[in-house]
C-alpha cells in the first residue's frame, strides 16, 4: 500500500555505525543541496497516512533509496580501513562548500529549531539540577568520620552509586577542593575525577576567559540556608578566617579590561543635590539700622527716608545729621564707581585711575621705568601738562596720539628730572625730548642784544650730519610757531656760513660733536647760559669715537647751575626753581638704543639721579618689521636675486639697500640703474651737499632706491620705506638692528631681506636669536642647522672691550 511505502521511507534510516572502540563515528557532512529543510525530529509524531482513495505517487528520482544491507557486528565484522588524505580533504572541502552556501529556512522551520534548542536546554538544566541534588550530602551525615552516619557504609554506597551514574552520564571533572568554595564536604575517599564542577555564577560572564578568572578568584554563588549552616559549622570548628584580603579581582578585571568608553550618562550618575527649598529661596536677613546688610541702604529712597526720620526725631541737630548721611551715601556710590574693576583704563577718568590701571597701561605699551618719584605716564595729549599753545602746534603738525616713549618720557622731563631713554629706533624719540625742551626754555627770559652772545639755552648732540639736520627740521615745526630759533652746526659746511647763521643768536643748537668742539675752540660759540643738554643716539656717538668730544662739550658747560647729587635731584619743585632769579638747574637727557659701559660712564658722571625709561627690550628689532634671511653666495647671484626682488612689484619705493664697503655703493647703484630703477648713493666720501641732495631726492620720490653704508643706518628717517635689503650682512647685530629699523617706522609695517654667506659666521648666532624672538619672522632651516649659529662667536671680544672702554674708536665717519 501507499501508506506502507511512506512508513518504510521514514523507517528506512540506516542504523548508526559503531567504530572499533565502541564510539559512534562523526556525523557525515550536510548534503550539498542546502535548500532542503532538515528532517523533523524523532520526538514529533509522524503525519497520518494518506487515504486509500488517492492514487499512489508517481515514480520520481526523489524516491527513498533502498535499505542498505546490514553489516555484521562483533568479531566477524570487517574492520574499517584508514581514511586516505584525499578522502579527508574531499570531505573537508565538501563541508566547507556546504557551510558557505546560504541556507533558506522558512518561518515554521526556524520556530521548530528554536523550540528544539529550548527543549534541549531545559532538559540539560533539569539533568544538572538532579545530579547536584543526588551528589549533595546532608549536613551532619558526613561519612567515615564518626560524626556523620552510623558507619562509613552509607558513604561508600553513595559514592559507588555516584560513580556508576557519572560513568553513564557526560560528567565534567572539576578542580581541587580548595577551588570549590566550601560548597559541600566530600568524603576523603573520593577520587580526583569524581569531583563535581563548580556551580554556575548567577551573573553570566562576558567571555570565557573572564568566567574562568572569576571562578578561580572565588566568585560565590547565591547563599542559601544550607550554605550558611555549613559556613557556621566551619567557623565553629576551624575558627574565623584571619588576614582576609579585601582585594577584588572582579573590580580589577572590570577596570583593566574596559576598552570601550561610554560617552552617555545615566540618571544614577547625577550627583547634584535634589531640589531643596532652602537653597532655592534665599533668606533675607533684615538687620538693625536704616538698611539691611552692614547697615547700608540699597537704594537712595531708603537713605532719604532714614534722613527724614532723623529730622523729625531731632529738630535741632537732626537736619545736619541727615545731610551728613546723604553726603556719605553719595561718596559711597562714587567710590564704588571709581573702584570698579570691570572698566578698562581707557574708559575711566584720570582721577579714577588706580595703581592696577596704571600697571595695565604700562604693560599695554611695554613701558618700564626705574628710579624714584617717577610720575605716571600720560594717556593722551589733553591729559599732559603741556601749555595750550604747544598743544595747538602739536595738533597742527598732526600728532594724534603720543607714542610709547612720548607717554612715559614727557611727564618725567616736565618735572626737570634727568632722564635716560632706552627705546628702539623709529619710536618717536625726537618729539619726546623736543616738547619738554620747548616748555623749559619758554620759562626763561627771551634773548636780547646782550644775552644772545652768551650762547644758546639748549644744545642737542647727534652722531651724524644727516641725523642732526633731520632733528633740525623736526624742531622747527614746533619752535618756529613759538618764536624760538633753531640752528644746526654740522660738518660739510663752511664755518663762516654757520657763524653767519648764529649772528642773531639761537635758543636751540643741533650739532655733531666734532664740529661743535671746533666752534668752541675757535670762539665762534660759547655755552655760558646753556642749561639743557640732549644726547641722541649716545651709543652711536661712542662707537664713532666721539667720547672725547662729548666730554669736552659737557666740561665746557657752566657749573653754577649743576644739580646736587642728593635726593633733592628727584624733587620736582626744588629742581624747577630759578637760581638768582634767572637761571635754572641744568637738565640732561640721554637717548640710546643700547647701554655699553662707556655710555654708562658718561651717564654716571654728568647725570644726577636720572630716571630710566625703557620701551620694549634693549637690542631687539621693531615688531612691525618682517625679517627674511636668504643664503646667497657670490656678488653675481646676489645682484640677480636683487633684480628679482625689485622687478617683482611687491614692494613700492622708496627702497634702501645697505652695503658694507663704500666702493660697493657705486657698483650696486650702477647695476640697479641697468635694471631700470633710479638710484642714489650715500656714504662717508660724499660731500655734505651730495648727501643732502641724495636724501632729498629719496624723500621726494624722485629716486626709487637708496644705496648706502651704515652711515644711513641710524637716525635717518625716510618716510614710508617698504623694503630694506642687506646686500651685505652687517658686521655686528647692533648695526643690523638699526639697518632694518629704517622700515616699519611710526607703527607701519615693513620687510627686511638679508643676503647671508659663510663669511658672516660671526653674526649668525645673534641673527638666529633675533629671528626667534620675532613673532612675524621665520628662521630658515639652513641658518638653524649652520655650525656657526649653534654658539656665540668669541672672535673680536678683546677689541670690542677696548672700544667700549673708550680707548679707541672706528673713526669719524659722520663727524665734522
Curated annotation (Swiss-Prot):
Q: Which residues form the signal peptide?
A: none
Q: Where is the composition biased (Low complexity)?
A: 202-217
According to its UniProt entry, the protein's GO biological process terms are: mRNA splicing, via spliceosome
Q: Is the keyword Chloroplast assigned to this protein? A: no
- Where along the chain is composition biased (Basic and acidic residues)? 87-100, 118-135, 154-169
Show the GO cellular component annotation of the record: catalytic step 2 spliceosome; cytoplasm
Q: Where is the Helicase ATP-binding domain?
A: 410-613
Instruction: From the UniProt entry, list the residue stretches annotated as the region Disordered.
Output: 1-106, 118-227, 781-816
Q: Which residues bind ATP?
A: 423-430
Subcellular localization, as worded in the UniProt entry: Cytoplasm; Nucleus
Q: Gene3D superfamilies of this UniProt entry?
A: P-loop containing nucleotide triphosphate hydrolases
Q: Where is the composition biased (Pro residues)?
A: 24-67
Give residue numbers for sequence motif Q motif: 379-407
- The record's EC number reads 3.6.4.13
Reaction(s) the record says it catalyses: ATP + H2O = ADP + phosphate + H(+)
Q: Which residue numbers does the motif DEAD box cover? A: 536-539
Task: Tell me which SMART domains the record gives.
Answer: DEXDc, HELICc
Check the record and name the SUPFAM superfamilies matching this protein.
Answer: P-loop containing nucleoside triphosphate hydrolases
- Role summary: ATP-dependent RNA helicase involved in mRNA splicing. May destabilize the U1/5' splice site duplex to permit an effective competition for the 5' splice site by the U6 snRNA, resulting in the switch between U1 and U6 at the 5' splice site. May also act to unwind the U4/U6 base-pairing interaction in the U4/U6/U5 snRNP, facilitating the first covalent step of splicing.
Q: Which family does it belong to?
A: Belongs to the DEAD box helicase family. DDX23/PRP28 subfamily.
* Self-association state and partner proteins as the record states: Component of the U5 snRNP complex.
Protein name, as recorded? Pre-mRNA-splicing ATP-dependent RNA helicase prp28
Organism in which the protein naturally occurs? Sclerotinia sclerotiorum (strain ATCC 18683 / 1980 / Ss-1)
Q: Which gene encodes it?
A: prp28
Amino acid at each position: 500500500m501507499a501508506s506502507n511505502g511512506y512508513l518504510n521511507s521514514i523507517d528506512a534510516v540506516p542504523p548508526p555505525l559503531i567504530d572499533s572502540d565502541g564510539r559512534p563515528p562523526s556525523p557525515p557532512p550536510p548534503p550539498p543541496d542546502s535548500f532542503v529543510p532538515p528532517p523533523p525530529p524523532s520526538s514529533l509524531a509522524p503525519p497520518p497516512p494518506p487515504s486509500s482513495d488517492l492514487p499512489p505517487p508517481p515514480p520520481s528520482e526523489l524516491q527513498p533509496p533502498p535499505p542498505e544491507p546490514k553489516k555484521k557486528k562483533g568479531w566477524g565484522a570487517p574492520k574499517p580501513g584508514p581514511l586516505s588524505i584525499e578522502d579527508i580533504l574531499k570531505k573537508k572541502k565538501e563541508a566547507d562548500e556546504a557551510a558557505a552556501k546560504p541556507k533558506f529556512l522558512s518561518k515554521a522551520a526556524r520556530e521548530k529549531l528554536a523550540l528544539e534548542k529550548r527543549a534541549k536546554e531545559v532538559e540539560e538544566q533539569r539533568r544538572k539540577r538532579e545530579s547536584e541534588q543526588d551528589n549533595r550530602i546532608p549536613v551532619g551525615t558526613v561519612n567515615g568520620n564518626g560524626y556523620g552516619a552510623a558507619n562509613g557504609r552509607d558513604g561508600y554506597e553513595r559514592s559507588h552509586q555516584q560513580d556508576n551514574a557519572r560513568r553513564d552520564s557526560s560528567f565534567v571533572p572539576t578542580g581541587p577542593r580548595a577551588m570549590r568554595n566550601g560548597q559541600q564536604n566530600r568524603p576523603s575517599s573520593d577520587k580526583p575525577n569524581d569531583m563535581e564542577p563548580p556551580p554556575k555564577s548567577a551573573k553570566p560572564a562576558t567571555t570565557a576567559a573572564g568566567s574562568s578568572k572569576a571562578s578561580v578568584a572565588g566568585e560565590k554563588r547565591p547563599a542559601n540556608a544550607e550554605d550558611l549552616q555549613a559556613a557556621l559549622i566551619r567557623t565553629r570548628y576551624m575558627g574565623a578566617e584571619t588576614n582576609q584580603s579585601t582585594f577584588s579581582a572582579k573590580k580589577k578585571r572590570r577596570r583593566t579590561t574596559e576598552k570601550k568608553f561610554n560617552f552617555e550618562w545615566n540618571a544614577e550618575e547625577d550627583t547634584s543635590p535634589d531640589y531643596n527649598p532652602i537653597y532655592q529661596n534665599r533668606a533675607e536677613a533684615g538687620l538693625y539700622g536704616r538698611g539691611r546688610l552692614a547697615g547700608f541702604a540699597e537704594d537712595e529712597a531708603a537713605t532719604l527716608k532714614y534722613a527724614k526720620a532723623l529730622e523729625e526725631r531731632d529738630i535741632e541737630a537732626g537736619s545736619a545729621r541727615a545731610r551728613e548721611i546723604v553726603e556719605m551715601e553719595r561718596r559711597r556710590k562714587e567710590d564704588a564707581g571709581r573702584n570698579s574693576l570691570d572698566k578698562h583704563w581707557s574708559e575711566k577718568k584720570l582721577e579714577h585711575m588706580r595703581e592696577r590701571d596704571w600697571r595695565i597701561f604700562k604693560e599695554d605699551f611695554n613701558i618700564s621705568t626705574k628710579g624714584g618719584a617717577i610720575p605716571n605716564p600720560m594717556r593722551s595729549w589733553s591729559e599732559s601738562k603741556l601749555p595750550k599753545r604747544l598743544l595747538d602746534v602739536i595738533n597742527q603738525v598732526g600728532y594724534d596720539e603720543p607714542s610709547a616713549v612720548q607717554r612715559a618720557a614727557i611727564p618725567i622731563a616736565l618735572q626737570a628730572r634727568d632722564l635716560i631713554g632706552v627705546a628702539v629706533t623709529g619710536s618717536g624719540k625726537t618729539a619726546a625730548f623736543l616738547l619738554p625742551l620747548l616748555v623749559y626754555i619758554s620759562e626763561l627770559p627771551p634773548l636780547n642784544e646782550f644775552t644772545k652772545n652768551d650762547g644758546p639755552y639748549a644744545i642737542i648732540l647727534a652722531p651724524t650730519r644727516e641725523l642732526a639736520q633731520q632733528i633740525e627740521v623736526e624742531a622747527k615745526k614746533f619752535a618756529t610757531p613759538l618764536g624760538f630759533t633753531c640752528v644746526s652746526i654740522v660738518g660739510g659746511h663752511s664755518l663762516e656760513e654757520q657763524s653767519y647763521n648764529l649772528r642773531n643768536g639761537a635758543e636751540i643748537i643741533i650739532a655733531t660733536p666734532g664740529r661743535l668742539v671746533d666752534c668752541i675752540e675757535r670762539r665762534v660759540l660759547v655755552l655760558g647760559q646753556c642749561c639743557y643738554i640732549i644726547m641722541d643716539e649716545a651709543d652711536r656717538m661712542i662707537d664713532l669715537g666721539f667720547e672725547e668730544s662729548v666730554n669736552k662739550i659737557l666740561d665746557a658747560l657752566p657749573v653754577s647751575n649743576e644739580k646736587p647729587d642728593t635726593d633733592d635731584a628727584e624733587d620736582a619743585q626744588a629742581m624747577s626753581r630759578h637760581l638768582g632769579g634767572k637761571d635754572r638747574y641744568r637738565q640732561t637727557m640721554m637717548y640710546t638704543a643700547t647701554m655699553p659701559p662707556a655710555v654708562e660712564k658718561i651717564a654716571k658722571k654728568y647725570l644726577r639721579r636720572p630716571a630710566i625709561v625703557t620701551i620694549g627690550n634693549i637690542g631687539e628689532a621693531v615688531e612691525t618689521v618682517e625679517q627674511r634671511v636668504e643664503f646667497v653666495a657670490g656678488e653675481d647671484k646676489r645682484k640677480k636675486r636683487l633684480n628679482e626682488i625689485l622687478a617683482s612689484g611687491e614692494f613700492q619705493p622708496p627702497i634702501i639697500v645697505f652695503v658694507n664697503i663704500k666702493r660697493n655703493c657705486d657698483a650696486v647703484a650702477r647695476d640697479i640703474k641697468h635694471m631700470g630703477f633710479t638710484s642714489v648713493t650715500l656714504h662717508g666720501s660724499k660731500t655734505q651737499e651730495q648727501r643732502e641732495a641724495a636724501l632729498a631726492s629719496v624723500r621726494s620720490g624722485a629716486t626709487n632706491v637708496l644705496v648706502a653704508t651704515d652711515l644711513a643706518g641710524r637716525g635717518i628717517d625716510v618716510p614710508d620705506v617698504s623694503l630694506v635689503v642687506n646686500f651685505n650682512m652687517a658686521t655686528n647685530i647692533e648695526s643690523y638692528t638699526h639697518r632694518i629699523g629704517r622700515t616699519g617706522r611710526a607703527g607701519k609695517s615693513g620687510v627686511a631681506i638679508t643676503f647671508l654667506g659663510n663669511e658672516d659666521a660671526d653674526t649668525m648666532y645673534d641673527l638666529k636669536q633675533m629671528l626667534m624672538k620675532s613673532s612675524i619672522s621665520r628662521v630658515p632651516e639652513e641658518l638653524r642647522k649652520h655650525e656657526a649659529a649653534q654658539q656665540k662667536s668669541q672672535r673680536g671680544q678683546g677689541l670690542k672691550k677696548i672700544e667700549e672702554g673708550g680707548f679707541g674708536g672706528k673713526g669719524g665717519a659722520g663727524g665734522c
